C-alpha cells in the first residue's frame, strides 16, 4: 500500500514538544499532568505578557500583572481582536504558522503561532 502522507521525524526542542511528541502522557498521574499543564500555561502567559505590548496593556487594564499564580486569572482577548489587530509576540519571520478563521461574518481573523 502506498502512503501519500509525507512523514517526518520531529525532534523535541522544548518541554512542551517533549510532552506532545515524545512522552507517553498516560504514564503521568492526573495530578502530575495538571501540574505540568499549569506550569506550561503560566510560562506561556508570562512570555506573551513580556513580549507583546498590546497584550501587556490589556492585562494591566484588567489589573493583572505577570505574577499571577492561577490559570483562571489569565486575561483572554476576545476573538474579535484578531479580526482588527495584528498581534505578535515575536518577529514575523519567527512565525511558524498562521491560523485563519472561516470569515463567516465577512472578515477573517488571523492568529500567528510562534515557536512557544
Curated annotation (Swiss-Prot):
Reactions that this protein is recorded to catalyse: a long-chain fatty acid + L-cysteinyl-[protein] + ATP = an S-(long-chain fatty acyl)-L-cysteinyl-[protein] + AMP + diphosphate
GO MF, one annotated term: long-chain fatty acid--protein ligase activity
Superkingdom as given in the UniProt entry: Bacteria
EC number(s) stated in the UniProt entry for this protein: 6.2.1.19
Pathway where this protein functions: Lipid metabolism; fatty acid reduction for biolumincescence
Any one of the GO BP annotations: bioluminescence
Coiled-coil stretches: none
Cell wall biogenesis/degradation in keyword set: no
UniProt KW keywords: ATP-binding, Ligase, Luminescence, Nucleotide-binding
Family: Belongs to the LuxE family.
Functional note: Acyl-protein synthetase activates tetradecanoic acid. It is a component of the fatty acid reductase complex responsible for converting tetradecanoic acid to the aldehyde which serves as substrate in the luciferase-catalyzed reaction.
Protein name: Long-chain-fatty-acid--luciferin-component ligase
Amino acid at each position: 500500500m502506498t502512503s501519500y502522507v509525507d512523514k517526518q521525524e520531529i525532534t523535541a526542542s522544548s518541554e512542551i514538544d517533549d510532552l506532545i511528541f515524545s512522552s507517553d502522557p498516560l504514564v503521568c498521574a492526573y495530578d502530575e499532568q495538571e501540574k505540568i499543564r499549569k506550569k506550561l500555561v503560566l510560562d506561556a502567559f508570562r512570555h506573551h505578557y513580556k513580549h507583546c505590548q498590546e497584550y501587556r496593556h490589556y492585562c494591566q487594564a484588567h489589573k493583572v500583572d505577570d505574577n499571577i499564580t492561577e490559570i483562571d486569572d489569565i486575561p483572554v482577548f476576545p476573538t474579535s481582536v484578531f479580526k482588527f489587530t495584528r498581534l505578535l509576540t515575536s518577529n514575523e519571520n519567527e512565525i511558524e504558522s498562521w491560523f485563519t478563521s472561516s470569515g463567516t461574518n465577512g472578515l477573517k481573523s488571523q492568529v500567528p503561532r510562534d515557536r512557544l
